[in-house]
Amino acid sequence: MLYDVQKIKEILPHRFPFLLVDRVTALTSEESIEAYKNITINEEVFQGHFPIKPVYPGVLVIEGMAQAGGVLAFVSMFGEEASNHDEKIVYFMSIDKAKFRVPVTPGDKLVYRLNVLKHKGSIWILEGRAYVDDKLVAEAELKAMVADKEK
């Protein structure tokens, strides 16, 4: 375990029910991250998506990848001081090449793997993939920016 949920909460501003990363298991600064979220039937989203046959929304899979990418960007830029930058936030800039291949359902361990494609200053372009049982379930190219919260 690299970062548990308490450490992740020190880095990201997201909170329940929108914190979509439970743990970071691998991180190489300015290169890559692996993290996961355990999907349970208790997720609020399953009350409406879909009650008879619950499917975790693809948009939340992408958001989880983006949050993992936010941890990677913060740790890459600020190192061990990543949790001491409350004045900064990561914003999504774009999502490209998104594909959803297999539905994610309750009981799945959703693993996010992201690699840095390009990084310049506070701008990050990441290749993200999500897996369940080592099977690719979704992928996307994400662009994000670390910015001041007040701007």
Curated annotation (Swiss-Prot):
It comes from Wolinella succinogenes (strain ATCC 29543 / DSM 1740 / CCUG 13145 / JCM 31913 / LMG 7466 / NCTC 11488 / FDC 602W) (Vibrio succinogenes). Pfam families: FabA. The active site is at residue 49. It is found in: Cytoplasm. One of its GO terms (cellular component) is membrane. Its main location: cytoplasm. One of its GO terms (molecular function) is (3R)-hydroxyacyl-[acyl-carrier-protein] dehydratase activity. This is 3-hydroxyacyl-[acyl-carrier-protein] dehydratase FabZ. Keywords: Cytoplasm, Lipid A biosynthesis, Lipid biosynthesis, Lipid metabolism, Lyase. GO terms for biological process: fatty acid biosynthetic process; lipid A biosynthetic process. SUPFAM superfamilies: Thioesterase/thiol ester dehydrase-isomerase.
